[in-house]
């Protein structure tokens, strides 16, 4: 009987922990116009930011038919996040880059930092609060 009570307590606590391990982030992506697909990546660490889709804790794609694009995305609980979005105008499934570095399609980072070279996670990191909308402004 004692084992069953312990098991029930552990399962109950696991349920509480699971619900506390996720949060919703509200995102608005401005400047996309009406062509292509908008890709959104959310990173919770510098690992893979901003290029490696597989390192993102959330990825989503939206066929562009409205500006702005608005979404509520569920991500694992973390202290901070860095978001990257781009508009895949030619719909080839990737961000086209000149010499493998310079974006050739509209893109945006959270906090909209001015960057020369590869952006740093710390420059784009945000700590969203309940109800806050993170605005990403696409630029060429």
What are these regions (language model features)?
Residues 1-8:
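Bacterial N-terminal signal peptides that target proteins for export
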Residues 68-76:
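Exposed aromatic-hydrophobic patches
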Residues 79-89:
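A short, solvent-exposed beta-strand micro-motif common in secreted/extracellular proteins
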Residues 90-97:
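Acidic, glycine-anchored loop motifs typical of Ca2+
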Residues 105-140:
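Extracellular beta-sheet/turn segments enriched in Thr/Pro/Gly and aliphatic residues
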